[in-house]
Amino acid sequence: MKSRRVVITGLGMLCPVGNKVESAWEALKSGRSGIETLSAFDTSSFTTHFGGTIKNFDVSETMPLKDAKRMDIFMQYGIAAGAEAFADSGLDVDQLNPERAGVSVGTGIGGLRNIEETSLLIDRSGPRKISPFFVPGAICNMISGNLSIRYNLQGPNLSVTTACTTGTHNIGVAAGLIANGQADVMLAGGAEMATTPVGLGGFCAARALSTRNDDPSSASRPWDADRDGFVLSDGAGVLVLEEHDHAVARGAKIYAELVGFGMSGDAFHMTSPPEGGRGAALCMQNALQSAGLNPEDIAYVNAHGTSTLAGDIAETSAIKSVFGAHSTALAVSSTKSMIGHLLGASGAVEAIVTILSLRDQLLTPTINLDSSAEGCDLDYVPHTARDAKLSYALSNSFGFGGTNGSLIFARYS
């Protein structure tokens, strides 16, 4: 990020506590949980009966119903978040140089519900009943494709898929394209809709999910001694990234500056982090180096914080390794405590939360943290939000396959 400056000029988000950025932000500041018993299908035979879903979503606000019927819900969510972000940015399609504007929005899994329903259709009625829109309505890059068509974005058009790090990686890659001069404007982020029978069943089989069925709202409890797994959730987050001078020239509202991006690989295990979190530590170190910052410059970490036994302690250990004595002065909190794990969307949604924390100088809480687990002894902002003085904040995402990403944002003035 040492060449052209990259700023954030638009935000769009759907998550289990709100279908727009500001409504979700108000809920997160108040520490409200969006986790509930799932009702779209019968979960009685599953070990987990709950998750985080999008409530009262009206796709007709974003696109004609005939178009929506041709695509999986994860695409609908991603396009809705992209539309909110584009409108929020104040960009004018007619004034935008289309060859200098692009999109990088991904998903961790893709059109899972569409695939499930089409598989059932084949069993019931045979292959001739498959919709001609099945493939373009399910594949991972089609949020980017649809947003590109919608806004005539003729620049870079891509979609990074890296499990739970998807949103973060798409933002970082898009920022790099602006920084190195290949684009002036990029829409970037991630979307997911995996609270389906196969999605829930797959994560149950992996024993990754909490089974606190008697009290879903307290199930996501990062760093708590009684945590027992993550909560599967849906949503989308899209940011408008823009070259600084381009944004200033058109009088854009600037939320924050993206100053650092780091990546790493655990090279250890498909689903578990290495003891001590060395991959996560390297990722944060790379982000700091990219930003040209010292560990002491960071005041807040929006953690990956999934509420898993191994993941929470590994991230805590990694933070201690990177920040040393300064780790005791850091504020660290988990958005997932309130909205669960949005998989490929989580990094983008949490980046938005980090940006709004910088804007409002406020830390969102880690709810359900009643008794910290052994070795989890940082300031996790338990239970309630609080004011803070923030100049730089870091957001972490770590995914299956050992894929890691960290973003550093600076308060803009």
Each model region followed by its residue ranges:
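Flexible, low-complexity linker/loop segments at domain and module junctions
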Residues: 1-8, 93-98, 291-297, 328, ...
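ACP-dependent fatty acid/polyketide chain-elongation machinery
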Residues: 1-67, 89, 245-257, 352-366, ...
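Conserved beta-ketoacyl condensing-enzyme motif
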Residues: 8, 29-162, 191-202, 295-311
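Glycine-/small-residue-rich "gating" segment that lines the acyl/pantetheine channel
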Residues: 124-131, 172, 176, 185, ...
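Active-site-adjacent elements of ketosynthase-type condensing enzymes
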Residues: 47-53, 110-114, 193-220, 262-282, ...
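Condensing-enzyme catalytic core mediating Claisen C-C bond formation in acyl metabolism
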Residues: 5-9, 36, 214-291, 300
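Active-site-proximal alpha-helical scaffold in enzymes
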Residues: 78-91, 140-144, 148-192, 230-252, ...
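Phosphate/pyrophosphate-binding loops at sites that engage ATP/ADP/AMP, CoA/4′-phosphopantetheine
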Residues: 85-97, 247-254, 284-300, 322-326
